[in-house]
Amino acid sequence: MTELKPLLIELGTEELPVNALPNLSRAFFEGVLAGLERRGIVVDHGEAKSLSTPRRLAVLLTAVAVEQPKQYRELFGPYLNTAFDTEGKPTKALEGFAAKCGVNWRTLERIRDTKGERFVHRVVVPGERTDALLPGILTEAIAGMPIPKPMRWGAHEYLFARPVHWLVMLFGQDVVEAEIMGVKAGRISRGHRFLYDKPVSLSGPQNYIDVLQAAYVLVDPAARRARIVAEIEAVARQVGGVARITEDNVAQVVNLVEWPSAVLCSFERVFLEVPQEALIQTMEVNQKFFPVLDSLGKLTEKFIGIANIESNDVAEVAKGYERVIRPRFSDAKFFFNEDLKQGLKAMGERLRTVTYHAKLGTLADKVARVLVLAEAIAPQIGVDPLLARRVALLSKNDLQSRMVNEFPELQGVAGHHYALISGELPEVAMAIEDAYRPRFSGDEIARSPLGKVLGLAERLDTLACGFAVGMKPTGNKDPFGLRRNALGLARTIIESRFDLDLKVLLDQASDWVAFATTIEQERHAQESVKQSKKEAAVKHSVPQVSDEKSARIEELYDFIVERLRGYYADKGIPTTHFNAVAELKPVSLYDFHRRLDAIGRFAALPEAEALAVANKRIRNILRKAEIKIPASVDATLFDQPAESGLLVALEGVITDTRSALDCKNYVSVLTCLARLRPPIDEFFDKVMVNDENLMLRANRLALLQRLGEYLCCVAAIEHLSN
């Protein structure tokens, strides 16, 4: 049985970049495992641990084979007919092979294959010891790490994320002889920089985590995270509040500390007059603090910082955190008060001076386009067009506020607050903020109907603009954020169950963008001509039907639908189901969703596979047809019972599903289609479609054409075929 030993590799460094640490740790761990695997060294992955702190990267494996497995090799020699001469003496071929193997030819074994009997020499190659291979494995692992900005230090030419100061390599109780980046491996690690600033001797890998903990280092990120969350929640409870803990903030703090300790802090209540989102943004993003909320979710004057030490004077640590945050809060309060002096309406007047795009006019022009689209969408989903107009008119005003200039993430949020203060209706104020949702992957869509209207109009205009001026995404470049906007648009429609004609909306958006580009061309060409926008609208806003415009709308539609591929894949929807619906190009994305749901249920039926295969066969037959197919089926030309049987069954299904299809009850329609399997099977078993009689052939093709069209009334089901 193979002997196994625990393995510990720890690379000690100066503080690693917080954002790079997770990837560095993962790559280091995976690189070591991959190096062992490439060399055939057995590893028990069940207890493998990737460990890290800001000052170290470590790999801890509880069971690693002490050597590579033995390798059994076969060296093949000559066949018998060439191994001996006519007198039965060994030829030079046999003697040379034996000499190469270092044995007498008489000791060679014989085997038989398809060509006859031949000589073979079997050897056992012992595996190399793991400790001899580890230095090379470590070097490879480090070389493969994704270091964003490698650096040199001292007089060395080594490159790494930060200077390397120590290296621990223990295999069992023994130190592995190695030198990496000028540092020799040993058993000496380091404790916490301030709480235990001295060497830590490790007897073996097994007690690594416990020994480091005694030196005030929690080397397991999961343990640090659990401690951080537990302490934050406990401190917040002490003051009767609830801590706001976001995954992003916790992940950052975990990679900033080795020995976390929660510290309760506070700020002056006067700062609570500022929109709480600005204060929260400052605490979380800029300082990595955790705000404390009351039972209603409103910000209190308390917050929690995570120190990297256990201080004897916690109050002094708290004062330091409070001193850091006060200037930022003072700035936010100043910006807020300055914005209140001018008001939301005055901010909007400056949109005329801000260029949205050289070919698309100003932000005020964009607002005008969004306003028209919002008015068109609103009545389709039961929203007052006047409210839609009002919220669109105010939607971009906060972009000219001091607050948003300082905190760009608060666009929409600031507008919400300023609209309420200005006396706007609550639903209008909420919609200004709501329209930005979803802001990121996994975020919720807009909550209010009015916010959804504005969000749809905004994204439609952005998409139409991006495509009109040639700013389509390429690779990882997406300057207009079109991919994000397309998915946000699609999610809002689908998750809100809006049965909107997407192509009509894209058509309207494209018309107004075409109008905008025309106006800009005229502005540049005729600077002295003061033509009114109203006159230009009469001249240019009439929809121009052209092949180019139709192609652009189709391109936009396809771009939006393609964003849904990943959206549904994340929900476990098979690609074949998605392709089946996408081929039909439903104009309503909510209709697309319902068809996709129905296809999922249909695919579970026992008849689904057979019908999918049949439909694929029908398409192939029709594609290869070399004669003109009649528009209708002539039942008088049938000469086989299977033909009439199929037509009767098809007509029955069409009649029975007409109402369900009109009501878009696609599950019912597809369930009904399952009844066609027996007559379809009988038709293909007993009827020769490509009959020599051209009239019979054409009529049978017409029957298959009608059948194929109805089989695809919900989705192109041949995609379900295996």
UniProtKB/Swiss-Prot annotation:
Among InterPro entries, the record links this protein to: DALR_anticod-bd (IPR008909), Gly-tRNA-synth_bsu (IPR015944), Gly-tRNA-synth_heterodimer (IPR006194)
Q: What is its main location?
A: cytoplasm
Q: Name one GO cellular component term.
A: cytosol
Organism superkingdom: Bacteria
Compartment list: Cytoplasm
Swiss-Prot/TrEMBL catalytic activity: tRNA(Gly) + glycine + ATP = glycyl-tRNA(Gly) + AMP + diphosphate
E.C. no: 6.1.1.14
UniProt keyword list: Aminoacyl-tRNA synthetase, ATP-binding, Cytoplasm, Ligase, Nucleotide-binding, Protein biosynthesis
* GO molecular function terms noted in the UniProt entry: arginine-tRNA ligase activity; ATP binding; glycine-tRNA ligase activity
What's a BP term from Gene Ontology annotated to this protein? glycyl-tRNA aminoacylation
- What PANTHER family would the database entry show? GLYCINE--TRNA LIGASE, CHLOROPLASTIC_MITOCHONDRIAL 2 (PTHR30075:SF2), GLYCYL-TRNA SYNTHETASE (PTHR30075)
Q: Which family does it belong to?
A: Belongs to the class-II aminoacyl-tRNA synthetase family.
Record text on subunit structure and interactions? Tetramer of two alpha and two beta subunits.
Query: Which HAMAP family does the record associate with it?
Result: Gly_tRNA_synth_beta
Protein's name in the database = Glycine--tRNA ligase beta subunit
Q: Which organism is it from?
A: Xylella fastidiosa (strain Temecula1 / ATCC 700964)
